[in-house]
């Protein structure tokens, strides 16, 4: 059974009910909507289509809204055509938005472009395809020397590696998009270009103000500043997306894999979800099979301990969206089989919290008894994630009375969530847990299961692990 979850970006190729149903069958767990593209009518229809499929088939999936985020882009060029730049030539960026660009100058969207940069800084355009070095700053213009040949287009992203940028965490478009997400009841927001703790706090306050206090925030780490402030960002977030695309432009490409491993490790320790994203099966946008390197990359992220792996263009606009999900699911299943439990987490001398100690003990017991299932009663999802932290061989069945928690746990590795009407007592939980275990086919008659619970209210009081035979 596949334990690692798959996030699929849904676009024109995959938005129909028929395709969404096939994607769920193939292994999709979370639908990602990329708000850098599309309008509210399109995204609203995609959400409706997925909900229709779920209500017809009983399948479970969560919805993730990915913000455009505060970014710098090039503006207009003459005739809207790309211009060819040559290595060694001089090229100018201006903050005067009325300028129509050519092969010597282009306007950018960011007012503070001239004040944030200094001579000697690097400017990268279009995911780093064109590099330039700042040679002078004059008024509202930044004059650069072009470092390599390339074609510059309109609306292309501009990165300033190693430069601290004074952009707000939420652009005006993001604020409107988040309100739309609150109205639609999405489960997660993936917040782009998070640089510091206050960015996350600002987004959380905006969500709360519009009825989205239950929406979980997944912070995307895409630059050096985000890496430098990673610990404080993690503390303020519900999860992290390792956004390797922009990150690989902002920091040296050979550093990306080490940043990935560091972030995944810290997320596991903090019991926060982590998604590994970007270019995972990139060649499948055009080809029916991935490269061997891509297959290895997906497996490597899973071995690192990621909760989920993500498809972007592969499932949104590629030629082989279904094949991409199927192949990714196959790699997940194969790699999940060799993952061993990690009971040595917290070998540091830190004292365990009660919940963590009980959950660790439950995993250890399940391993020793070869139990196929650990059943957890959870209100907000923390207990289920505390069990997941130790990578049990057993599947984690999370029973919750909270519909939001049931959907959000869809993103956690190895967790199957089940919404139940009510749990009135510990005995009630044991009875319910056994019933669901058998009905779902996750365990058979005669199997040993470990059950984890606590005081029924309030949440956060897990204190009991017990062993039962079905």
Curated annotation (Swiss-Prot):
The record marks 220 as: Transition state stabilizer. CDD domains: Pyruvate_Kinase. ATP binds at residues 34-37, 73, 156. Pathway: Carbohydrate degradation; glycolysis; pyruvate from D-glyceraldehyde 3-phosphate: step 5/5. It holds the Pfam family PK. Substrate binds at residues 32, 220, 245-246, 278. K(+) binds at residues 34, 36, 66-67. Its cofactor is Mg(2+); K(+). Optimum pH is 4.0-6.8. One of its GO terms (biological process) is glycolytic process. Mg(2+) binds at residues 222, 246. Gene3D superfamilies: Phosphoenolpyruvate-binding domains, PK beta-barrel domain-like, Pyruvate kinase, C-terminal domain. Its EC number is 2.7.1.40. One of its GO terms (cellular component) is cytosol. InterPro entries: Pyr_Knase, Pyrv/PenolPyrv_kinase-like_dom, Pyrv_kinase-like_dom_sf, Pyrv_Knase-like_insert_dom_sf, Pyrv_Knase_AS, Pyrv_Knase_brl, Pyrv_Knase_C, Pyrv_Knase_C_sf. Keywords: Allosteric enzyme, ATP-binding, Glycolysis, Kinase, Magnesium, Metal-binding, Nucleotide-binding, Potassium, Pyruvate, Transferase. It catalyses: pyruvate + ATP = phosphoenolpyruvate + ADP + H(+). It is an enzyme of class 2 (transferase). The keyword Oxidoreductase does not apply. PANTHER family: PYRUVATE KINASE (PTHR11817). This is Pyruvate kinase I. It comes from Salmonella typhimurium (strain LT2 / SGSC1412 / ATCC 700720). The lineage of its organism: Bacteria, Pseudomonadati, Pseudomonadota, Gammaproteobacteria, Enterobacterales.
């Amino acid at each position: 059974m596949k334990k690692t979850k798959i996030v699929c970006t849904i676009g024109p190729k995959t938005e129909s009910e028929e395709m969404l149903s096939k994607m769920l069958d193939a292994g999709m767990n979370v639908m990602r909507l990329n708000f850098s593209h599309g309008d509210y009518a399109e995204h609203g229809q995609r959400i409706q289509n997925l909900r229709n499929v779920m209500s017809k088939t009983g399948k479970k999936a969560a919805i993730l809204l990915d913000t455009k985020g505060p970014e710098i882009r090039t503006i207009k060029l003459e005739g809207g055509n790309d211009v060819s730049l040559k290595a060694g030539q001089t090229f100018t960026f201006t903050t005067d938005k009325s300028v129509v660009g050519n092969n010597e100058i282009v306007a950018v969207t960011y007012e503070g472009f001239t004040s944030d940069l200094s001579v000697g800084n690097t400017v990268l355009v279009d995911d780093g395809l064109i590099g330039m070095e700042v040679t002078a700053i004059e008024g509202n213009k930044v004059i650069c020397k072009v470092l390599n040949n390339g074609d510059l287009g309109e609306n292309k992203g501009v990165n300033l590696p190693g430069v601290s940028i004074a952009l707000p965490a939420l652009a005006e478009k993001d604020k409107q998009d988040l309100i739309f997400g609150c109205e639609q009841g999405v489960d997660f927001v993936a917040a782009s270009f998070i640089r510091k703790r206050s960015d996350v706090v600002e987004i959380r306050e905006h969500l709360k103000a519009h009825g989205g206090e239950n929406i979980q925030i997944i912070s995307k780490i895409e630059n050096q500043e985000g890496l430098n402030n990673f610990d404080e960002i993690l503390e303020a977030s519900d999860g992290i997306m390792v956004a390797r695309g922009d990150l690989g432009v902002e920091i040296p490409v050979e550093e990306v894999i080490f940043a990935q491993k560091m972030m995944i490790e810290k997320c596991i320790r903090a019991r926060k979800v982590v998604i590994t994203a970007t270019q995972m099966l990139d060649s499948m946008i055009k080809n029916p099979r991935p490269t061997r390197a891509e297959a290895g990359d997906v497996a490597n992220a899973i071995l690192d301990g990621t909760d989920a792996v993500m498809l972007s263009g592969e499932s949104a606009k590629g030629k082989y969206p279904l094949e991409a999900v199927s192949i990714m699911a196959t790699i997940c299943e194969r790699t999940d089989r060799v993952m061993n439990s990690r009971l040595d987490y917290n070998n540091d001398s830190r004292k365990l919290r009660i919940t963590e100690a009980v959950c660790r003990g439950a995993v250890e017991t399940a391993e020793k008894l070869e139990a196929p299932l650990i059943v957890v009663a959870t209100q907000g999802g923390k207990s289920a994630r505390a069990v997941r932290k130790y990578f049990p061989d057993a599947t984690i069945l999370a029973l919750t009375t909270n519909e939001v928690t049931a959907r959000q746990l869809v993103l956690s590795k190895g967790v199957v969530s089940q919404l139940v009407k009510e749990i009135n007592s510990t005995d009630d939980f044991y009875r319910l847990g056994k019933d669901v275990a058998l009905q779902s086919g996750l365990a058979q008659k005669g199997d040993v299961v470990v059950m984890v619970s606590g005081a029924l209210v309030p949440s956060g009081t897990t204190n009991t692990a017990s062993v039962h035979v079905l």
